[in-house]
Amino acid sequence: MHVVIAGGHGRIALRLEQLLAERGDSVEGLVRSAGQLDDLARVGARGVVCDLETVSLEDLAGGLSGVDAVVFAAGAGPGSGSTRKDSVDRGAAVMFADAAELAGVPRYLMISTMGIERAGAAGMDQEFTDYLRAKGAAEADLRAREIGWTILRPGPLMDEPGSGFVRLAVPSLPFAPVPRDDVALVLRELLDTPAAVGRTLELTAGAEPVAEAVRVALAVG
């Protein structure tokens, strides 16, 4: 499988790149700077310098020709401000989908977040509200497309080692954290699961092995 990951230097992306490379997939990660390329090479991925906020649609689509699946793992990050929340978490996700459709890519997986429906809740700061709204807008755009999309909404992300055991379901799960290791494992499983097309799933730490959790979530949902 040939997979391209936007936000290829992110902590989930690097884990997913390694998982895919280890099983023999061809993996490319789009990164913002040449200084990040060595980190991708160390996990077995090919890094491509591509700023999603400035690249043209035609150039981005050209780089996706012949690709089997794309994963949107990019994000503006904490402290980036409301403007970049919109330009990256929404705008770049939309453009990546435009490019994938133009290139004929059959699958698009988006890493979103739990809690989108809470945007603007009492006591929530404006930047986080804008982040949730940007993610919600990106999700809505993707659902309206013909591409084979899947949206994964993990809970709060942790860097502690994953267990390989998760809880996965259609929205909405009780709010709970999940290790980035396990998010990457679930993404790999979803890439291999055609039945995940057109589904939105929420993910936390749990008690089911990843493959079983995916099977059950798709059967029930």
Regions found by a protein language model. Give the residues of each.
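Non-catalytic, hydrophobic alpha-helical segments
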Residues: 12, 70, 152, 183-187, ...
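N-terminal Rossmann NAD(P)H-binding glycine-rich loop of SDR-like oxidoreductase domains
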Residues: 1-25
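NAD(P)H-binding glycine-rich loop region in Rossmannoid oxidoreductase-like domains
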Residues: 29-95, 99-102, 191-195
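Substrate-positioning beta->alpha
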Residues: 134, 174-189, 199
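Glycine/proline-rich active-site loop of Rossmann-fold NAD(P)-dependent oxidoreductases
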Residues: 120, 161-166, 190-199
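Core catalytic loop region at the nicotinamide-binding pocket of NAD(P)H-dependent oxidoreductases
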Residues: 190-214
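Conserved Rossmann-fold NAD(P)-dependent oxidoreductase catalytic core, especially the SDR/UDP-sugar
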Residues: 26-28, 34, 76-141, 145, ...
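Flexible, glycine-rich beta-alpha linker
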Residues: 118, 150-169, 203
